[in-house]
């Protein structure tokens, strides 16, 4: 079993000037292969689980103070169809070619929540995999226009990267490299916001 791989960080920041009220910031984190052994779920299986290497104290705190789903199911057994459902709010078979693993094409007639948030004044951005393998030009979250990969994209291959680097410099240094990459990507997103967002 591979380590949990966070493949999505969809970042959204609110603009309070559009509606006159203080709208919340939204950070949507979506992961492939999260599994029952990862982070907050680890307590269910015990501290000696196979993913004990991955320490996610902030995610765990949010999960413990909010809702933690321990019996949830995806609408499809593959990443792209599942993600097309999450992005659109539709069953994957109602998203047409957007549910195809390789060569997915988004139908612009199907609304997606990231672009709807952007229309209402939110600053949106993403880092790492969001919908389908590769970087499709018509992605339903702004595609290249909203990408924040300035720090790199090695986090997409968390377990492969740490496994390759760990023998020379240790697991902690390998993990820190990846965390720094994530911080740089997020800082670039924050730096791009317009005033009031």
Features from the language model and the residues they span:
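Formylglycine-dependent sulfatase
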Residues: 2, 11, 18-197
């Amino acid at each position: 079993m591979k380590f949990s791989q966070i493949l999505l960080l969809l970042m959204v920041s609110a603009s309070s000037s559009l509606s006159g009220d203080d709208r919340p910031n939204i950070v949507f984190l979506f992961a492939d292969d999260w599994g029952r052994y990862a982070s907050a779920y680890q307590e269910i299986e015990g501290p000696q689980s196979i993913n004990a290497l991955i320490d996610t104290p902030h995610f765990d705190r949010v999960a413990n103070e909010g809702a933690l789903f321990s019996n949830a199911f995806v609408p499809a057994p593959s990443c792209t169809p599942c993600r097309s459902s999450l992005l659109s709010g539709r069953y994957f078979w109602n998203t047409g070619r957007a549910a195809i693993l390789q060569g997915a094409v988004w139908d612009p007639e199907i609304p997606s929540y990231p672009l709807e948030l952007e229309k209402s004044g939110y600053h949106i951005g993403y880092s790492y995999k969001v919908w389908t393998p590769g970087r499709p030009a018509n992605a339903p979250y702004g595609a290249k226009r909203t990408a924040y990969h300035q720090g790199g994209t090695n986090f997409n291959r968390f377990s492969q990267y740490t496994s390759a680097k760990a023998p020379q410099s240790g697991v902690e240094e390998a993990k820190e490299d990846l965390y720094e990459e994530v911080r740089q990507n997020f800082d670039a997103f924050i730096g791009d916001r317009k005033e009031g967002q």
